[in-house]
């Protein structure tokens, strides 16, 4: 949902801004983390941090976009279900960890995907997206001070810790 729009930019505006920078965006979720990255020219590092901060801190969590994502996830579930290696790994994790989060499918329970709503995403965001739980990394010929300033400027709205127990 990160690239589906923010409170200040539509998904089209986000895509155009990335294209104008020549940015390469990627996102990946695993059992223990979610990673968002923008690969840009060194002169655009602060701008990239600004975009990532906007996507993480100001995500619009639009219900129409959520429905599109749920359709995509359902299709991925079906595709993965037909891949024996993926199914075997999911089953191995479930049987090893059962009720622990590590035992749950990365993309969620395929029978429950359709029940997820915007409120679920907001609760997940509140519980997991906070200062102590986020790492921002910049590599290459970038100004450390500019990156630190950009992080402080663009991620300041997140609480330092979570209030969710």
Q: Language model features by range: what are they?
A:
Residues 13-164:
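Charge-rich, well-structured scaffold segments of protease-associated domains
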């Amino acid at each position: 949902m990160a690239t589906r729009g923010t409170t200040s930019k539509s998904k089209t505006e986000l895509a155009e801004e990335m294209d104008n920078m020549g940015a390469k965006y990627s996102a990946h979720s695993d059992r223990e983390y979610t990673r968002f990255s923008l690969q840009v020219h060194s002169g655009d590092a602060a701008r990239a941090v600004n975009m990532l901060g906007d996507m993480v801190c100001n995500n619009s969590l639009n219900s129409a976009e959520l429905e599109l994502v749920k359709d995509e996830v359902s299709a991925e579930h079906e595709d993965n279900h037909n891949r024996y290696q993926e199914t075997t790994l999911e089953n191995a994790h479930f049987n090893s960890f059962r009720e622990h989060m590590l035992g749950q499918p990365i993309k969620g329970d395929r029978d429950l995907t359709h029940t997820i709503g915007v409120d679920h995403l907001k609760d997940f965001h509140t519980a997991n997206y906070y200062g102590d739980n986020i790492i921002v990394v910049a590599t290459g010929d970038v100004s450390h001070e500019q990156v630190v300033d950009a992080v402080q400027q663009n991620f300041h709205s997140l609480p330092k810790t979570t209030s969710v127990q």
